[in-house]
Amino acid sequence: MAFPTVEVLTELVTPVVAQHNMDLEGIRINKAGKKSLVAVSVDSDFRPDLDQLELVSNQISEVFDAGEAAGELSFGAGYTLEVGTPGLDQPLASARRWRRNRHRLVALEVEGKKSVERIGALNDDETAVIVVKRRGKKLVVRSVQLAENTQAVVEIEFAKPAEDELALTALEFDQALDRGEENK
């Protein structure tokens, strides 16, 4: 029996992840004889902590072990199971990831124009997000469409964010747009 495919593992892992109100972001397989790796990436609207990831990892391991014992799966000589969340260096590819990173700085590229701005609220249908940028002493608030031509990666920030920036990113979408119009 061959090493299980990503599709087969996805069918087995998705229900386990869903029990914990998480979403399966992806599965990566690196086959390397005795050192094969199955890396499972999960995410949710809340930030899963290490205890939650350990619980999910243990349950996925139990499902894989049961599949091997029943002869339905074969991981060969052995494998390492790794369960984690997408790293900060991963692009913000879903509305959930934008929502989860609210108040953080983001390196943003929209239609070829690059900038660093702070993430605010999403609109109701999750097709646009508020971003805030400081220009001198002034804060500029704008809406950015979450489209395929929008590239964004969270920036690591060592300094404490300015209170006025956080106040704007804490506002609801329409409130932030109104505040942006007032500041023009």
Swiss-Prot record:
Q: Which SUPFAM superfamilies match?
A: YhbC-like, N-terminal domain
Q: Which InterPro entries match?
A: Ribosome_maturation_RimP (IPR003728), RimP_N (IPR028989), RimP_N_sf (IPR035956)
Name the record gives this protein: Ribosome maturation factor RimP
Q: Which GO terms describe its cellular component?
A: cytosol
Q: Give a short account of what the protein does.
A: Required for maturation of 30S ribosomal subunits.
Similarity section: Belongs to the RimP family.
Q: Where found in the cell? A: Cytoplasm
Is the keyword Cytoplasm in the record?
A: yes
Give the transmembrane ranges.
none
Q: Which Pfam families match?
A: RimP_N
| Sorted UniProt keywords | Cytoplasm, Ribosome biogenesis
Q: Which organism is it from?
A: Corynebacterium diphtheriae (strain ATCC 700971 / NCTC 13129 / Biotype gravis)
Q: Provide the GO biological process annotations.
A: ribosomal small subunit assembly; translation
The record's Gene3D superfamilies line, in alphabetical order, gives: RimP-like superfamily, N-terminal (3.30.300.70)
Superkingdom as given in the UniProt entry:
Bacteria
- Gene behind the chain: rimP
